[in-house]
């Protein structure tokens, strides 16, 4: 309701996702956290919802106030807009949130880390494979697709530490037909990228944002070195490090 997307309230989200998936289509989920009505429990609610859904690709973003929007004007009137923002989704928001900012950043980072943990990601891929409606096969695989499959088998099925999850998905996909096999391979490749990107880029950037708060620095990216280094106060205490406990 706060986003004025009332069309999303006409049907239960889980029912809508199930209908679309059983029709043979794939749902890609987009979620936003950081609304004024959101409390720290929002992250557990988002996780509980996604655990029940056949949605491999899910992106959660923190609310951002865009110039010229009703949200921007309201926050400006309330004196909550920040003067400096680099537009980085994986940093501090460009306004002062109602939720404790540490709780917002930590909860967001841990939710993203869980979404793209290997076990959770492949579990959603298998859920989609199980529920997806069958699509008639109308063409044979091209040489390019065969080559892509062989490269995927080598990089994900042999070299990757996630190879067991990959082969489990592949075996289940083989039983569902050629088109499902294509889709499973695509999911595996996408997952390999997203799992690494979340671990190597998203989480470290969120940790730096938490360090910024600990250092008592008002949000201004110009106060940081271009190499993405630490705030001037030095290394933060260990309690600021994220520890969601998910399998990486």
Region annotations inferred by a language model:
Residues 1-149, 156-157, 232-247:
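A structural motif corresponding to the C-terminal lobe/cap of the Radical SAM core domain
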Residues 124, 136-248:
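Terminal low-complexity segments of carbohydrate-biosynthetic enzymes
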């Amino acid at each position: 309701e706060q986003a004025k997307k009332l069309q999303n309230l006409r049907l239960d989200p889980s029912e809508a996702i199930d209908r679309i998936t059983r029709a043979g289509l794939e749902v890609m989920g987009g979620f936003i956290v950081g609304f004024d009505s959101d409390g720290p429990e929002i992250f557990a609610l988002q996780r509980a919802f996604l655990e029940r859904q056949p949605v491999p690709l899910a992106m959660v973003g923190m609310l951002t106030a865009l110039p010229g929007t009703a949200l921007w004007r309201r926050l400006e009137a309330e004196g909550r807009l920040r003067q400096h923002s680099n537009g980085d989704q994986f940093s501090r928001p460009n306004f002062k949130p109602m939720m404790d900012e540490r709780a917002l950043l930590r909860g967001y980072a841990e939710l993203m880390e869980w979404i793209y943990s290997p076990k959770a990601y492949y579990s959603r891929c298998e859920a989609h494979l199980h529920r997806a409606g069958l699509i008639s096969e109308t063409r044979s695989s091209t040489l390019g697709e065969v080559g892509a499959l062989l490269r995927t088998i080598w990089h994900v099925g042999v070299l990757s530490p996630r190879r067991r999850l990959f082969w489990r998905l592949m075996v289940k996909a083989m039983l569902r037909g050629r088109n499902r096999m294509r889709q499973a391979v695509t999911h595996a490749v996408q997952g390999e990228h997203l799992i690494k990107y979340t671990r190597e880029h998203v989480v470290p950037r969120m940790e730096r944002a938490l360090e910024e708060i600990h250092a008592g620095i008002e949000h201004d990216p110009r106060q940081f070195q271009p190499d993405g280094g630490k705030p001037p106060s030095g290394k933060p205490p260990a309690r600021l490090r994220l520890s969601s406990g998910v399998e990486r």
